[in-house]
């Protein structure tokens, strides 16, 4: 069977995925690859399991983790009533780190391994986010939010 993302609807049965340094280096028939790598690898057998790639989230805000589903009649009302209040707490590096850990654990629980993530305007929110992501071997693109209107001085 084809072994490429050019054939996305292909299912491999009785196969082996060889991972080194957190990266997939080869995928193929179990009988072929287990012989090829027999002295180099330890095998973890996921019998009767489905192995899939991690999901990619192209737009997510980690500082809004604790205000998910908060009610607002408009975007500005929601930002002022919940989001900005929550985001100003990220000036505390310990708070930002705790939320980063919770947020990333939730992503992993739901199969997301890569994300384009918005942090807050506080530099430390980005630093602790990357530290937590690195500990979990996640692939993240992140940066601090920039605002130039309708902002609160406490979050810039």
Show where each model-derived region lies:
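Histidine-rich, glycine-flanked metal-binding segment
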Residues: 10-52
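Active-site gating loops and adjacent loop-to-helix segments of metal-dependent hydrolytic enzymes
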Residues: 66-96, 149-154
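Short, small-residue-biased leader/transition segments that mark boundaries at the very start
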Residues: 1, 5-12
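Short, surface-exposed connector motifs at secondary-structure boundaries
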Residues: 107-115
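Metal-coordinating catalytic core of metallo-dependent amide/deamination hydrolases
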Residues: 124-156
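Hydrophobic faces of well-ordered beta-strands that scaffold small-molecule active sites
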Residues: 54-58, 115-117, 140-144
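Short, acidic/polar
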Residues: 92-104, 126
């Amino acid at each position: 069977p084809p072994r490429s993302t050019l054939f996305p609807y292909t299912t491999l049965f009785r196969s082996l995925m060889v991972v080194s340094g957190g990266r997939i280096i080869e995928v193929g028939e179990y009988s072929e690859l287990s012989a090829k790598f027999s002295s180099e690898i330890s095998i973890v057998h996921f019998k009767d399991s489905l192995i899939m790639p991690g999901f990619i989230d192209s737009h997510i805000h980690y500082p809004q983790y604790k205000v998910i589903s908060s009610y607002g009649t408009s975007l500005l009302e929601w930002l002022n009533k919940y989001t900005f209040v929550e985001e100003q707490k990220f000036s505390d590096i310990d708070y930002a780190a705790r939320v980063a850990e919770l947020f990333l654990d939730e992503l992993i629980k739901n199969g997301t391994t890569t994300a384009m993530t918005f942090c807050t305007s506080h530099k430390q929110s980005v630093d602790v986010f990357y530290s937590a992501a690195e500990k979990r071997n996640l692939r993240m693109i992140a940066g601090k939010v920039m605002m130039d209107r309708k902002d609160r001085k406490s979050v810039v």
